């Protein structure tokens, strides 16, 4: 009989804060535990669940919420694949709390480490760890990791999150945690506790909004396999990484080609609605005409209703230049709802656009002009529009050569989109 477990939120938001200077995770935990606080009890419960059960635990990192499991136990890791409905050939990233834990993974027989982290990674670790950077390492013979973590690849991805709470949970659990984003596979990644499907801890919102950058320093030249919170131009300033190559494609890998890292093979980050992405610089009048034609002809609907969009809903997600609702209607905003994300508040304007004898409801969201604000609000916006049951989402893209997070944002959007438009 299948075990049934109710989703619960364990309140640990007070602990989701930067670590004080010159203070270790261990010292912080000993003080917190000695006070017998509700947050300490929640962390102990979560750690015990991770160590002894096959139930995944959602927890906040600085990027997105992760769905964590003990990376050393097959049953525990299988719980992630089951909860996310994730393909088994899509590898997982391992999260650690220290370099010492990485060394334990590289030297499964114990004793003094004989295998060290490759020197090529030292400049990156010095600059970006803890942080939103995942490195690929060789998986040793007799690996401590469950085989499901690597998807039978000879390497594994590992990172040390900058979120002090994430490292605290790993420290208390005393296990490396396999932790993909805590969402059903292919759906937008979660950036607040409310987005997480399984058992989770409410540590508040996440700061970056897109997942970690994945790099491979085992090849020559080294490569960025997935864009994320650390920009490729930042990486190129590190010794040995000046000629780092782009090793990813914004579309999913096809056929039986094995992914080198998480996030490469399958379509990701997709809401239920059809997503139409307009590349940066698209002519505004042409964009509005395209949307109008979809509304009249039903082209924006996944059902392709020949009678148009009478009574239907669409989302418009703006970044740098689009006016509200693409100026499709002079009607005043009927209603404004708020979606909170990372301490910011996203305004969702609800506007009625007349179409002959009927009308279409437009849900308009402005993410801001900076890559940082767009990254923080992107996944929350897609989820909010999903909750409104829109039929199609039209998104204003940004230039992916603007550095830092811009490439990561466009990578996620191209993976989500069914249609790319340049007009």
Where are these regions (language model features)?
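Active-site-adjacent structural elements in enzyme catalytic cores
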Residues: 1-423
């Amino acid at each position: 009989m299948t075990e049934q477990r109710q989703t619960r939120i364990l309140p640990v938001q007070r602990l989701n804060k930067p670590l004080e200077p010159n203070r270790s995770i261990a010292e912080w935990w000993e003080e917190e535990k000695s006070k017998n606080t509700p947050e300490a009890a929640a962390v102990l419960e979560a750690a015990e669940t991770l160590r002894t059960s096959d139930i995944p635990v959602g927890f906040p990192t600085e990027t997105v919420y992760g769905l964590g499991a003990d990376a050393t136990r097959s049953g525990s890791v299988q719980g992630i694949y089951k909860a996310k409905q994730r393909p088994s050939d899509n590898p997982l990233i391992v999260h650690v709390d220290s370099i010492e834990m990485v060394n334990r993974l590289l030297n499964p027989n114990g004793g003094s480490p004989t295998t060290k982290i490759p020197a090529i990674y030292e400049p990156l670790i010095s600059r970006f760890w803890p942080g939103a950077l995942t490195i690929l390492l060789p998986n040793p013979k007799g690996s401590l990791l469950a085989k499901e973590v690597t998807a039978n690849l000879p390497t594994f991805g590992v990172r040390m999150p900058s979120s002090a709470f994430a490292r605290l949970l790993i420290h208390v659990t005393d296990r490396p945690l396999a932790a993909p984003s805590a969402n059903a596979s292919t759906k937008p990644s979660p950036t607040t506790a409310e987005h997480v499907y399984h058992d989770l801890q409410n540590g508040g919102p996440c700061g970056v909004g897109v997942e970690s950058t994945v790099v491979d320093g085992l090849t020559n030249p080294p490569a960025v396999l997935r864009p994320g919170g650390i920009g490729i131009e930042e990486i190129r300033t590190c010794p040995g990484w000046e000629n780092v190559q782009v090793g990813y494609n914004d579309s999913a890998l096809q056929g039986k080609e094995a992914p080198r890292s998480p996030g490469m093979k399958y379509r990701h980050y997709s809401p239920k609605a059809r997503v139409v992405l307009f590349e940066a610089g698209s002519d505004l009048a042409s964009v509005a005409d395209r949307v109008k034609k979809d509304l009249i002809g039903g082209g924006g609907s996944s059902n392709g209703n020949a009678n148009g969009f009478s009574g239907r809903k669409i989302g418009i997600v703006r970044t740098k230049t689009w006016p509200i609702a693409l100026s499709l209607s002079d009607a005043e905003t009927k209603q404004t709802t708020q979606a909170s994300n990372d301490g910011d508040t996203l305004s969702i304007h609800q506007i009625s656009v007349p179409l002959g004898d009927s009308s279409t409801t437009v849900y308009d969201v402005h993410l801001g002009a900076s890559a940082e604000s767009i990254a923080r609000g992107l996944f929350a916006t897609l989820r909010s529009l999903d909750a409104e049951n829109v039929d199609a989402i039209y998104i204003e893209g940004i230039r992916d050569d603007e550095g830092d997070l811009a490439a990561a944002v466009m990578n996620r959007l191209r993976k989500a989109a069914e249609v790319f438009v340049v007009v």
